[in-house]
Swiss-Prot record:
Subunit composition and interactions: Component of the ClpAP complex composed of six ClpA subunits assembled into a hexameric ring in the presence of ATP, and fourteen ClpP subunits arranged in two heptameric rings. Binds to ClpS.
PROSITE patterns with a match to the protein in the record: CLP_R, CLPAB_1, CLPAB_2
Polar residues biased stretches: 148-161
GO annotation, cellular component aspect: cytoplasm; cytosol; endopeptidase Clp complex
Region ranges (Disordered): 140-167
Native organism taxonomy: Bacteria, Pseudomonadati, Pseudomonadota, Gammaproteobacteria, Enterobacterales
Domain of life: Bacteria
Protein name: ATP-dependent Clp protease ATP-binding subunit ClpA
Region (Repeat 2): 80-145
Pfam families xref list: AAA, AAA_2, AAA_lid_9, Clp_N, ClpB_D2-small
Gene behind the chain: clpA
Amino acid sequence: MLNQELELSLNMAFARAREHRHEFMTVEHLLLALLSNPSAREALEACSVDLVALRQELEAFIEQTTPVLPASEEERDTQPTLSFQRVLQRAVFHVQSSGRNEVTGANVLVAIFSEQESQAAYLLRKHEVSRLDVVNFISHGTRKDEPTQSSDPGSQPNSEEQAGGEERMENFTTNLNQLARVGGIDPLIGREKELERAIQVLCRRRKNNPLLVGESGVGKTAIAEGLAWRIVQGDVPEVMADCTIYSLDIGSLLAGTKYRGDFEKRFKALLKQLEQDTNSILFIDEIHTIIGAGAASGGQVDAANLIKPLLSSGKIRVIGSTTYQEFSNIFEKDRALARRFQKIDITEPSIEETVQIINGLKPKYEAHHDVRYTAKAVRAAVELAVKYINDRHLPDKAIDVIDEAGARARLMPVSKRKKTVNVADIESVVARIARIPEKSVSQSDRDTLKNLGDRLKMLVFGQDKAIEALTEAIKMARAGLGHEHKPVGSFLFAGPTGVGKTEVTVQLSKALGIELLRFDMSEYMERHTVSRLIGAPPGYVGFDQGGLLTDAVIKHPHAVLLLDEIEKAHPDVFNILLQVMDNGTLTDNNGRKADFRNVVLVMTTNAGVRETERKSIGLIHQDNSTDAMEEIKKIFTPEFRNRLDNIIWFDHLSTDVIHQVVDKFIVELQVQLDQKGVSLEVSQEARNWLAEKGYDRAMGARPMARVIQDNLKKPLANELLFGSLVDGGQVTVALDKEKNELTYGFQSAQKHKAEAAH
């Protein structure tokens, strides 16, 4: 329980008491022994105690007040007093309650303060040491402010004080120079102009504090770390050669500051140490966090206000980094703090600069993942990251792609593991990160695309022209021949109701295996409802919820987007869609960009249908499709129509197509009945009757669904629930020509099996 140093100190105290024939072992004996204990001695030094004076006072008190054993009683030994025993017990209890295993000399020193009536506690108070000072040092390494300079003008801080300052730096900062020496920092590639400006600012006489401002991921922290790396390598001007960069850990600085003034004391001591070491530079990452850090509720004294006086005088040098958003929203509002820094804009590097950066970092990643990156793979990582990963910036997102490609290669089974990462591997990683199809079309995808048109024509009848336009646009995009900054395709499907405009898009999403994002435009007829697509502006209800359209595309960037019955929407919706069709992006109310470059945009409309249904004059049927297109031109503005890839007119369904529709509905019904164990047979006469009954040129295929429901599904429902088809069976549907109605033959599963056996 007691550590070895404390046991040695206690043994020395008993030996001293026996040597002087003292009758009792007192708390003063204990404190005198602790002056030689490393742990207790360090705590007392941190509290600025004059150890020599304290030792003299203790020795004098012990000699004057402690009873001495008579020479005649040689057998009697020195006995510890009750107060001595209580001090050790309290130290043990205190350590146990804090979850530690060993009692140190510093813990015993804390316990001495509980013996208020003892001379030892009095002498500690006399030297301006409180129990809280010792506890703070044990828990957090907090030292009392060092006393003013000694009356002796030639006195210099001793080595112990210097060691205390170094320890304080180690507790609350990270030495980036030391980290660079052991290989913990990647080398800085490029950024010569920014680094040169930062060094110039650091060498100024006053206000020598550079502030690196840029978007997240552009390499602000890398510049500060790279400066430390170059100092270690000796690749800096002479005036910077002896500098050491410390990175501030604001979390450690705040941790454990329970009482008012703890944080200020700790931070002031750190600043004083930096001020004394003229070659030290403090790097504060996310420097906007110091505004308000350590401030009590309602108080104005925070880390920013504590550091301001030293910043303008040039006594300490600070490098800060923050983003444009935090700089304008938080940092710049404290004008007094902002003027003490020299803003340096860190812009996003170009593609060529990023390639150079990754080539410089490549050996580190190759050694870590045990792979090799080809030159084409590095360039592909940068170019694809720029093209498809829009929520981050170079070089960070390109480095992420390289790193993840190496990790993916490393995690492959040994039999499939490759030693080289090529362009195809990079494409696969980018496709997973951005949730888009791979640039290189696989064999399975190639088969899907080849048979896409035929598959859609088997599911949607009579609209071959529309299907061909859709599939050709998708094939061009997957072949890499589409517009780089536009959606895969932007189509307006026009035509009468019930002919398959919506069904084509539904079947397209199923065939490609991608998400269908469907928006019914009848919900956006009012002007104020348009904001729901991109999010409400600040001050309005729903501002924090984002936009329905932008959120859906951000979540599913590779999808089929269906805007159903677009003519019912407010005209402002058309204006929102202009930039989507032209530039492939849409910004929501929070500034997030939704990427539509891998979206198939389909809009449906019934505009112009009324013109096609006008009665013809005379015996010849007139083609009114030209009038229908004129109606579409009236509703949709020229700039809207000009951005569409195609306006596809869906024709009325012919009688031949209706027979195919009947067959499709019967197949769908059979699939439902298969789950019940029921087989369905419909004669050709019955199919012809259903086609004749359900055909309506103006209404399309929707009346057919109602005819199937009334004439097939309703009679089957009662038999499935209460009749002969409860346990399965067979249904035969035929036509009674005399009555001109359908007849139904139901056969239970058991009877069907018996007849089959005979």
